[in-house]
Amino acid sequence: MIATLEATYSFAKKFPHYKDFYIKHNDLVFSKLGLGTFNKEPYKEENYVFHYIEGVKEAIKSGINLIDTASNYRYGQSEKEIGIALEELFQENSVKREELIICSKGGFIQLEFPFPKNPYTWIEENIINTSLAKLEDIELDQHCMTPDYLEWSCKQSLKNLGVKTLDIYFLHNPEIQIGKLGYKIFLKKIESIFKKFE
């Protein structure tokens, strides 16, 4: 199930008092204001306490249908909170999945909360030993763009969000890899990612 023109248009019609708040683009009706879930200072323990759930629900009930997150935000906690909020809204019949435009991103390595004692061991066990990537595919100890890693990362996002599909999946700061790969190899890498996801 993905966002549809009919459903996103129907969602926008629930808020007739919002003049010029919605825009049609690529056969979907988006709220001009979206909900993002990035949080700075990732190593502070209080950043991992669930506190977005009610905010996500209130944003959607107030007319926002564009939700943006990433697999690495708060080590997956942001996606998990959105997933809880969506499940509650779906059960209340407050919104349908097709009315929402859900976006996530892949590229940065999504360590899991609680933060592993040794992130390098986590990367070795979960990414390298599972053949999602080789050590040399990982830039700055935190960014990976192999097609297999990104497919795995996307599946983790779907699981965290509790949905079967994403409407938009972004490559998260792919330019990080240009210095290491060079421009021509970088473009070939992007092409291989698109082929994997088509």
Regions found by a protein language model. Give the residues of each.
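N-terminal binding-site loop/beta-alpha segment at the start of enzyme catalytic domains
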Residues: M1-T121, K164
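Glycine/proline-rich, positively charged
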Residues: N126-E198
